[in-house]
Amino acid sequence: CFEPDMKLIRGIHNLSQAPHGCVLTIGNFDGVHRGHQALLQRLRAEGRQRGLPVVVMIFEPQPLELFAADKAPARLTRLREKLSYLAESGVDYVLCVRFDRRFAALTAQDFISELLVRRLGVQFLAVGDDFRFGAGRQGDFLLLQKAGAEYGFDVTSTQTFCEGGVRISSTAVRQALADDDLVQAENLLGHPFTISGRVVHGDELGRTIGFPTANLPLRRQVSPVKGVYAVEVTGLGDKPLVGVANIGTRPTVAGVRQQLEVHLLDV
């Protein structure tokens, strides 16, 4: 599903698969938008200069989804999509850390000394200046700078990427999608907004209106888009298909679920 050159490391316990020593960034990377892409380009240049691999550390689930699931924003990308975009950006390794209560209890000092220094051997670290980490969110950018001076690694702030006075961020992309401004969303992302998933058998109501229907349950509590859209569908044949998509909720025994229904035209 992603470039063979990029290696996915699932969990800290599998870090022996990665070489010791890296340039590193940490974040959610939701959407892998143009701001993320600019950061990754900068990291690749740093990695080439130092002769070190580029490592991106992400968390699954995202921290807010563990601590306040009802307040967590809609995801722009599933994990599989995120990995694909990161691979296209030239990342060497993605470390996907299982974010659970146990990991969240790790002290800020242990996060630095055990994970960043002992396990990863970080030489260059780029994070947002508002980055918080460790139990109780005790760790911050200043603590990382002090640790860098102590352990011998460089720490830099990820620069805000703006265009036309608009800060390019996952939040800005979500707002554009909420406003049904797909052109602006694509401009911020650097690629069209897509939703992917596995087609499942539905109730075959589509047959009664004369169009085949593809049903994709969305494994997320909330979708960044809802309503009816003209879409292009890939992965069901040799060429893209034209369709009309309806994104909304569907009643289930357990409550409701997010679902994407696509009526395929000219099939």
Which ranges hold each PLM region?
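Short, Lys/Arg-enriched N-terminal segments with co-localized hydrophobic residues
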Residues: 1-5
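Short acidic-hydrophobic, aromatic-tinged amphipathic segments that line or gate anion-handling sites
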Residues: 7-14, 74, 95
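N-terminal catalytic cores of NTP/NDP-binding nucleotidyl/phosphoryl-transfer enzymes
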Residues: 15-78
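Residue-level signal for inorganic ion chemistry
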Residues: 33, 86, 125, 185, ...
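A glycine-rich helix N-cap at a beta->alpha junction
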Residues: 78-94
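Classical nucleotidyltransferase
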Residues: 102-212
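Phosphate/ribose-recognition catalytic cores of enzymes acting on nucleotide-derived substrates
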Residues: 202-267
